[in-house]
């Protein structure tokens, strides 16, 4: 099924990308796909390799090994010019006016003069920058500079979006605006790859998530797929049970006790009914439920304690 | 989109960014104003300062005609006036209204001056005194007519044969040469520094990362160099043209054709010199990430320019046709400043001009490759200053 999809739907494919800085492997065989029309959340700790991967995609950094393809073809300069990029370290010409800056960048990406002006005005309006359109970028607040930077990534109607921490530094209203913009772009068939530390936002917004740790992809898939891979966790509330009643139950591990509720991770093939029976043996059971781990928990599981 | 369009877009941004800034307009206006001031100063103050005002009093008043003639042969322009009262004359010297007061009989003149007597004026006065003394001595010999002897002596002189026709415009040519040398030096320094600052600005503001996700490093560098170069060329042309027109109108210059030719040569050499220095300035700028570090990294490059300028002033004034001047003026780092100066003096053989241009162009090609490589290797690396060797490795 996946193979068929890969054939039918264009995708941004990151394939076996490696990049070393001295002794540090910033990327070690990083592979994943962002399909057209998909919002892909790229998650990982500081220095895990997100930014390096994105810079490799944009050709700002040359990979030591591996390849990045879009629609089946390895990326070249002409293809990358149709990408939209928000770098981790923001940067615009400080003394250039907002409108001029966006028009200039749109033209550099291949737009004609009129088209560039229309697109720049359009994004200025959409991102709420109208009153600042003639201001120099250096005179804007950081939040507004961030909006201009986003407009710079979007102004040339890119085929592919690669955004490094697009939500950081935005106020809640701007977060909503940007989320809507990203959904709309994905709806138009654009693959959107973005990194974020706001995992609740990623969980809410993204179709798929990739987790990277120390340069290696440790998990990749929809949040439900990640959940499925993390095993079954049950929560048991047995008020009459003595503390430690669940210790040593075959095939289970206690992962936490909270307000008298015991959380148990079940090994593959362990019958949850056996756990329920053991709980009932201690007295009444008020609650017995399967727990749906949040992305935050899945992330902690995936990267372990060592991150 | 073609590479040419990308380069043009980048160049156009530089043009707009510079031409619109107030500092550029003010800078050009100030340069023109300074030039006007210099020309006016030349035509009025310096012109007046060449006249020596001499007051004659008592018996010395008979010298009013002969002093002027005698002084002129020694290159001094004397305006003699009669002063009735020597005391009043001395007061005029003290006040600076007179440069010298001459009193006493012609055979024993006394001179009062402020501090020192101009050497040429002293010789002129000495000659007059000696003539007077000689005339008295000759008058004592009976069979001689003193006037005839003096006339015979006056007619005697060396016979001079010039190998070249005398160049009456020598001083003007030198002035034009020095002005073009100074203008070229300032333009190259200013616009070379601007290239470096522009590179550092893009690096320190990190805008270079989104630019390089779109265009290649060489396109970005070439666009910047072309854009700033055109601004510099326009500024030099405007200042130069205003200078020539003004100097001709005020009759400070009587060789407008030669001056215009010098300006055109100056623009040509500005282009060559700018291309030569711009790649070096850009490469140096790309090694640092903060504006504060720019001056330090540019110091070796600006030192070469300063050296070329100082050498240019000295050599062009003293020996525009000497071997050292000829050699230095064909070497690429110095040629863009020295050669137009020699051309202005009409001291540059066509072969040497062609050689200098060819060498500079070859150096431009070499430095563009080298500078482009350093730039591409260093432009995306932030943090501390990057060692040259690492930048070359890329």
Question: What residue spans do the PLM features occupy?
Answer:
Chain A
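C-terminal coupling/interaction segments
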Residues: 267-307
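A short, local hydrophobic-aromatic micro-motif
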Residues: 15, 64, 138, 253-255, ...
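Short, flexible helix/strand-to-coil boundary loops that buttress conserved ligand/catalytic motifs
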Residues: 79, 227-230, 299-302
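Structural motif
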Residues: 90, 250-253, 283
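ABC transporter nucleotide-binding domains
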Residues: 12, 19-213, 219
């Amino acid at each position: 099924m996946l193979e068929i999809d890969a054939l039918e739907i264009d995708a941004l494919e990151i394939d076996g990308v490696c990049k070393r800085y001295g002794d540090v492997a910033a990327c070690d065989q990083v592979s994943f796909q962002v399909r057209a029309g998909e919002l892909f959340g790229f998650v990982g700790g500081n220095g895990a390799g997100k930014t390096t991967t994105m810079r490799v995609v944009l050709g700002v950094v040359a990979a030591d090994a591996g390849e990045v393809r879009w629609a089946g073809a390895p990326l070249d300069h002409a293809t990358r010019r149709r990408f939209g990029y928000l770098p981790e370290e923001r940067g615009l010409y400080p003394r250039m006016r907002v409108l001029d800056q966006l028009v200039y960048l749109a033209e550099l990406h291949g737009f004609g003069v009129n088209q560039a002006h229309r697109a720049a005005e359009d994004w200025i309006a959409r991102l709420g920058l109208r009153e600042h359109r003639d201001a120099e970028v250096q005179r804007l607040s950081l939040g507004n500079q961030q909006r201009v930077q986003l407009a710079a990534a979007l102004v040339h109607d890119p085929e592919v979006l690669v955004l490094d921490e697009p939500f950081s530094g935005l106020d809640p209203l701007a977060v909503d605006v940007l989320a809507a913009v990203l959904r709309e772009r994905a709806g138009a068939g654009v693959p959107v790859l973005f990194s974020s530390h706001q995992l609740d936002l990623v969980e809410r917004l993204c179709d798929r998530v990739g987790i990277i740790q120390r340069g290696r992809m440790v998990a990749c898939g929809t949040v439900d797929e990640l959940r499925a891979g993390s095993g079954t966790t049950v929560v048991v509330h047995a008020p009459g049970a003595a503390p430690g009643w669940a210790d040593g139950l075959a095939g289970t591990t206690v992962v936490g006790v909270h307000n008298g509720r015991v959380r148990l991770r079940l090994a593959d093939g362990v019958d949850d009914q056996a756990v329920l029976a053991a709980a009932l043996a201690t007295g009444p059971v008020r609650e017995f439920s399967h727990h749906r781990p949040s992305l935050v928990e899945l992330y902690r599981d995936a990267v372990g304690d060592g991150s | 989109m073609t590479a040419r369009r990308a380069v043009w877009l980048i160049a156009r941004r530089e043009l707009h960014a510079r031409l619109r800034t107030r500092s550029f307009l003010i800078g050009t206006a100030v340069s023109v104003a300074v030039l006007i001031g210099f020309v006016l100063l030349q035509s009025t103050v310096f012109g007046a300062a060449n006249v020596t005002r001499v007051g004659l009093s008592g018996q010395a008043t008979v010298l009013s005609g002969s002093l002027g003639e005698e002084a002129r042969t020694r290159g001094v322009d004397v305006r003699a006036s009669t002063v009735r009262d020597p005391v009043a004359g001395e007061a005029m010297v003290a006040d600076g209204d007179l440069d010298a007061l001459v009193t006493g009989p012609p055979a024993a003149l006394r001179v009062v001056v402020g501090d020192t007597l101009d050497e040429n004026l002293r010789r002129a006065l000495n000659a007059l005194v000696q003539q007077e003394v000689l005339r008295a001595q000759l008058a004592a010999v009976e069979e001689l007519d003193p006037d005839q002897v003096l006339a015979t002596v006056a007619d005697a002189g060396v016979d001079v044969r010039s190998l070249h026709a005398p160049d009456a415009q020598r001083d003007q040519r030198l002035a034009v040469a020095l002005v073009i040398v100074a203008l070229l030096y300032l333009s190259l320094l200013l616009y070379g520094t601007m290239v470096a600052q522009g590179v550092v600005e893009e690096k320190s503001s990190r805008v270079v990362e989104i630019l390089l996700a779109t265009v290649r490093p060489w396109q970005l560098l070439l666009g910047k160099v072309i854009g700033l170069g055109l601004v510099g060329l326009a500024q030099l042309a405007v200042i130069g043209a205003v200078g020539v027109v003004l100097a001709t109108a005020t009759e400070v210059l009587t060789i407008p054709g030669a001056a215009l030719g010098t300006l055109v040569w100056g623009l040509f050499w500005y282009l060559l010199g700018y291309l030569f220095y711009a790649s070096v300035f850009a490469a140096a700028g790309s090694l640092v990430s903060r504006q504060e570090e720019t001056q330090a990294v540019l110091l070796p490059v600006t030192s070469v320019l300063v050296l070329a300028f100082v050498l240019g002033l000295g050599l062009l004034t003293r020996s525009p046709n000497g071997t050292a001047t000829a050699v230095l003026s064909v070497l690429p780092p110095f040629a863009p400043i020295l050669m137009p100066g020699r051309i202005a003096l009409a001291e540059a053989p066509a072969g040497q001009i062609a050689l200098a241009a060819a060498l500079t162009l070859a150096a431009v090609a070499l430095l563009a490759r080298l500078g482009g490589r350093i730039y591409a290797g260093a432009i995306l690396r932030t943090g501390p200053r990057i060692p040259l060797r690492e930048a070359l490795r890329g």
